[in-house]
Amino acid sequence: MSTPARRRLMRDFKRMKEDSPPGVSASPLPDNVMVWNAMIIGPADTPYEDGTFRLLLEFDEDYPNKPPHVKFLSEMFHPNVYANGEICLDILQNRWTPTYDVASILTSIQSLFNDPNPASPANVEAATLFKDHKSQYIKRVKETVEKSWEDNMDDMDDSDEDDEDDE
């Protein structure tokens, strides 16, 4: 059934395929356009550089009038990310407007890697280290970057096994 939300999500998907912003990718699940997998690559010249961070975006029928529920699936050590992966970002709450699309959501999240907001911490430990002990903060972030590589390699191994099951 085609609804305004589903039509908009198909437009968002077309845009992501044709003109994806650097360092982000996203696509709906094959059987559900309302649920998307996404990935953000850590930007250069940040402690997150070259990390591969997976996210889940869940939309409801009120999209684009309401923001999606977005969370990191990859472990993330960041002042604005809760332990459960949920993200403290104004455009996902009180500053949402229907002009935002999947690409702009992901680039806004990616910009948090460059510019964390320790004044509005979701992770108090990360915010404190970011403000007061930058070298310890960077060390912890680099650990999550390495873990992101391991997790993605594990996922690739799992998908290889799935492919073998199909044969």
Swiss-Prot record:
Q: Which GO terms describe its cellular component?
A: chromosome, telomeric region; cytoplasm; HULC complex; MUB1-RAD6-UBR2 ubiquitin ligase complex; nucleus; Rad6-Rad18 complex; RAD6-UBR2 ubiquitin ligase complex; UBR1-RAD6 ubiquitin ligase complex
SMART domains, alphabetically? UBCc (SM00212)
* Spans annotated as Disordered: 148-167
Metabolic or biological pathway, per its Swiss-Prot or TrEMBL entry: Protein modification; protein ubiquitination
UniProt-annotated location(s): Cytoplasm; Nucleus
InterPro entries in UniProt: Ub_conjugating_enzyme, UBQ-conjugat_E2_core, UBQ-conjugating_AS, UBQ-conjugating_enzyme/RWD
> If you read the UniProt record, what top EC class would you report for this enzyme, in one word?
transferase
Q: What reaction does this catalyse?
A: S-ubiquitinyl-[E1 ubiquitin-activating enzyme]-L-cysteine + [E2 ubiquitin-conjugating enzyme]-L-cysteine = [E1 ubiquitin-activating enzyme]-L-cysteine + S-ubiquitinyl-[E2 ubiquitin-conjugating enzyme]-L-cysteine
Q: List the disulfide bonds.
A: none
Q: Which domain of life is it from?
A: Eukaryota
Q: Which residues form the active site?
A: 88 (glycyl thioester intermediate)
| Xref: Pfam families | UQ_con
Question: Under the GO molecular function aspect, what terms does this record hold?
Answer: ATP binding; proteasome binding; single-stranded DNA binding; single-stranded DNA helicase activity; ubiquitin conjugating enzyme activity
**Where in the sequence does UniProt note compositional bias of the Acidic residues kind?**
151-167
Q: What does this protein do?
A: Catalyzes the covalent attachment of ubiquitin to other proteins. Plays a role in transcription regulation by catalyzing the monoubiquitination of histone H2B to form H2BK123ub1. H2BK123ub1 gives a specific tag for epigenetic transcriptional activation and is also a prerequisite for H3K4me and H3K79me formation. Also involved in postreplication repair of UV-damaged DNA, in N-end rule-dependent protein degradation and in sporulation.
Please state what the protein is called. Answer: Ubiquitin-conjugating enzyme E2 2
